[in-house]
């Protein structure tokens, strides 16, 4: 029997956003009117149930874990500007309600200072959950984790090998992630990074050399790597519930 590991941050946000409705209060002939934005929590519940029922049917998984990000984030301790670009974005009205409902009804899972991606990565690569695990997310960052994946939007299963997972990690170190507000190595976009990493054996050495070639230090490379890396079982202290910062290879 397989357990589905769900990126519930995405589920809660998508449901909360999709249930918002703007209403114009006034007659068509009125010069001015009042606009309000509302969301019905019952609509949220219906959509959440539909989403999880569809997941279970499509994946044939009966067991589900819904991972959520903690309010605190260890990456912000490394780099205070991490995800700072998101602070001014308005959150959907019922986001908190959706999180709480999923936590209560779909085996919510949260750990101090970790993001949902980290929780999925740790659970997928450890024996905390017995049997087969399937990572369910649309987030490309989780391609850093070896194992079986399911994209709920495309409704596709795909596998990631350990070698592919490691490559995807080093790739992310160089290109950075504008969405999460860390820059990687200057001048390294997708094409240049793929060419640079192609057919290389010691990818971490390649990454460090790229940073040095841009006038940066090995410490700069390590900082970007720690921001980019999705935690695996080897990156987590289970006893003390603390992330183990990546130190290079």
Question: What residue spans do the PLM features occupy?
Answer:
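Non-catalytic, usually N-terminal nucleic-acid engagement modules in DNA/RNA processing proteins
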Residues: 1-65, 69, 76
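A short secondary-structure junction motif
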Residues: 19-21, 73-85, 230-233
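Extended two-metal-dependent nuclease catalytic cores across DNA- and RNA-processing enzymes
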Residues: 27-31, 35, 59-61, 85-249
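Conserved phosphate/metal-binding and DNA-contacting active-site motifs used
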Residues: 54, 73, 78-79, 92-95
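Short, internal active-site loops enriched in acidic
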Residues: 70-74, 140-141
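A short acidic (Asp/Glu
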Residues: 14-17, 75-81, 144-148, 194-195
